Amino acid sequence: MGVVLITVVTVVDRHKALPNSSIDVDGHLWEFLSRQCFVLASEPLGIPIVVRSADLYRFSSSLLTLPKACRPIVRTRGDTAIALDRNGVVYHEDRMGVSIEWLSVLSGYNHLNSSLIINQPYHLWVLGAADLCKPVFDLIPGPKRMVYAEIADEFHKSWQPPFVCGKLFETIPWTTVEHNHPLKLRAAGGEDTVVGECGFSKHSSNSLVHPPTVNRVIYAVVDPARLREIPAPGRPLPRRRPSEGGMRAPRRRSRAPAPARSTAAAATPPRPGDPRAPAARRAGDVTWMERLLWGVFGRTSTR
């Protein structure tokens, strides 16, 4: 089956931009996000594969408890950068043999979808900055989930994603799971993009207390292709025109009158054996939307 879902865990500044590299963010914030990632990866949606930047080794102690095959790394700074000093904090990388190494997230994604490994559903988690996450949005198609911490500061070097994090949709408390919760009402209404603010309960474990520099932690299901079609609040949908730049406009169809259809045949509903009848959905079939929202409303996501 390969990769059925991708979740990106990262940090954004007040401009909704990602840091260029991991060392641009406080290590304690990465430690907090790695613990969040470890807890959330217990969702029953495929085998969790958590790939991270190698320079987050010191702040990923909780992820090191996963099986070695489930916690690969990517050396975003090359094979020679074993330790980096940033503001007095040393960002150690994994030593040779400690973790499985991927050349990039894209190569690992292709490996999980190949026939070289066991045919199982995989949930790929990506923990890191733009040097690790940018290819996920640029080169891997399809919608992706995001769990990102928003801080009030501004990164000196950053990358602005093609979509706007948390701008088009209001934030919703993520920990509320009542039957009339807005997320469930949205899912029932057929919406396929939701954004929720991950709430922090007073009775939460001390290991999940967020650092004071974090304004909020946002959960989002992002489809960059769909977000480009949705206008900002208060703006109408843009009218589609023939593409410019040498492309020919589509041919006009002939205005010849179409043959009249029998009103009786059109009004008659299709029978089950009729080829016009829609294919009946089997009880075990799961749509991609139900699979995508499974992790939102599943019992293990109500932490």
UniProtKB/Swiss-Prot annotation:
Region Disordered, annotated ranges: 230-284
Any matching Pfam family: US2
InterPro entries: Herpes_US2_varicellovirus (IPR003485)
Biased composition regions of type Low complexity, renumbered to the chain: 256-268
Family membership: Belongs to the herpesviridae US2 family.
Protein name, UniProt field: US1 protein
Gene symbol of the encoding locus: US1
